[in-house]
């Protein structure tokens, strides 16, 4: 880039003013050409930068967007058991054919049991606008003492009646 001194800039200052009736058609043609070039550059950029880079992000969080993944498939049989079906990472048919043709070792393969876990949130730590129920608060308090003899006596009385 060419650098000019202040004196040179004052000499290069245009002394001619534009006429009131200048040709706007040429000016608009130049603007349209620039718009087309910018559009082509954006298309080229988007073709190379696929994925979340092409998306616009709001400026308040400055983070990458969270890409949602599909939920795993869980099937429930007639007995009520739920089984988790994992994604297959490749074609298993090719691997089975290779192992059948070349029996090199007869080591048993360990399989991982697949289970579905249900997680319950700890509701005491979740804030709410609704006031707490006193029955829940009483149920959460630990029992300070337990009289085993009183419990045995009450069971014996129930058996006799």
UniProtKB/Swiss-Prot annotation:
PTM annotation (Phosphothreonine): residues: 99, 101-102
Modified residues (Phosphoserine): 78, 91, 154
GO cellular component: cytoplasm
Top-rank taxon: Eukaryota
Family affiliation: Belongs to the CAF20 family.
Function: Acts as an inhibitor of cap-dependent translation. Competes with eIF4G1/TIF4631 and EAP1 for binding to eIF4E/TIF45 and interferes with the formation of the eIF4F complex, inhibiting translation and stabilizing mRNA. Binding affinity for eIF4E/TIF45 is 10-fold less than that of eIF4G1/TIF4631. Required for induction of pseudohyphal growth in response to nitrogen limitation, probably by regulating STE12 translation.
Quaternary structure and partners: Interacts with TIF45.
Name of the protein this chain belongs to: Cap-associated protein CAF20
Native species: Saccharomyces cerevisiae (strain YJM789)
